[in-house]
Amino acid sequence: MARIKGKDTKPELIVRQYLYSRGYRYRKNVRTLPGTPDIVLKKYRVAIFIHGCFWHGHEPHLRLPKSNREYWEQKIARNRERDEENKERLRRLGWSVMTVWECQLRPECRRDTLLEIEYHLNHNYLNQFRQPRPYNDTETGTPQVAESNTQYQKTTE
């Protein structure tokens, strides 16, 4: 397991290259945030985790090794728990969290996944400015719209 890369994996590079080509600027592997998200877009308040299907237990694609099965079940269960804890901590800090699975970046569905990431970023950014503001009526009395004394004269032609 010491040879397993934790940074700059192929799925991460695919997402980062797409975001950069579309004009998004980001930080990678930000250690100051819970869970050290793979990609952080501070302007959009979005943290993106890119998970491998095996290591993080993505159900449709999870195949445990036949040897030492109990160890792998516990390890992957703990990874899932830790992922959920980190996501919840980020949400409490005001971050929107996205999880992109390795299988979502396969060539047949990559385009849809990348467009979905971009949609989420834009939607999240716009929602920062759409916060409802309470109406405050600070004026007392009814405001006057028309002139106070207007004399209308009949015009003759």
Regions found by a protein language model. Give the residues of each.
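Nucleic-acid endo/exonuclease domains
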Residues: 1-99, 103-157
